Amino acid sequence: MKGVILAGGTGSRLHPLTRITNKHLLPIYDRPMVTYAIETLVSAGVTELMVVTGGTHAGEFLRLLGNGHEYGIDRLLYAYQERPGGIAEALGLTERFVDGDRVVVLLADNVFERSLRPAVTNFLAQESGARIVLARMEDPAHLRHLGVPELDDQGRVVHILEKPDDPPSNHVVTGVYFYDERVFEIIPTLRPSGRGELEITDVNNWYVERRQMEYDVLDGFWGDAGESIDAYYEVNDFVRVHGANKG
């Protein structure tokens, strides 16, 4: 299975910090944010990676990561997203790298307390389809700003809503997604959303509608360090005290 780390975007929610660098190069405790995403995948056994970035600081990822061997990566490639076209568009740039394999996609501003190895193992045991990782969240106001799954009586995902006014569950979709090879057939069929981007939620709902979406529920802390300045410092404080990607 290949791994894709998405490290693009404008980082506008972290201005003014991101006026001088890519948000994924900002520090989380004692090292750059993107290195936690790399550690997340490598510690879960995924060691062939592609980093997708964009903007004016793309070269800094090469300076930081090089060939990736220092971080336990067996093979590291890079792709450049020329404009902010959405997560699904960024994933589409990796098709030749993935080359018919399965893929795990990780947003580089997502930080996890616990290892994702159980989710990787569960996805590899799936015959086909997709898999997401959910986190429990009790704050309705926060739920309204995230992707929220609707679950039926059997606990199966029946729809994923983006930023719902009335959240249908107390779970959120974190920034890690697992797909079979069909994902690269789905992406070209997507229509841009109102903000002009190809949305990963539309990809996920394609699998949901065909009853081919499974999920795991996280144990431990999960934070989106790119969500806001407050969230960025919350993740920093947690990692400083508790660490990340623990087995």
Enumerate the predicted regions with their spans:
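Short, conserved catalytic or adaptor-binding loops enriched in Gly and charged residues
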Residues: 67-73, 150-152, 206-208
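Conserved donor-nucleotide/metal-binding helix-loop-beta segment in metal-dependent transferases, i.e.
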Residues: 114-143
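A structural signal for short hydrophobic beta-strand segments in well-ordered beta-sheet cores
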Residues: 25, 149-151, 215
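Short loop/edge segments at beta-strand edges and connector loops
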Residues: 80, 107, 134-135, 161
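Conserved N-terminal catalytic core of the sugar/cofactor nucleotidyltransferase
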Residues: 2-5, 13-16, 27, 31-118, ...
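Anionic-ligand binding region
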Residues: 133, 139-170
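Active-site glycine-centered loops adjacent to acidic/histidine catalytic or metal-binding residues
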Residues: 9, 109, 136
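Catalytic-core segments of class I nucleotidyltransferases/pyrophosphorylases
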Residues: 121-124, 156-246
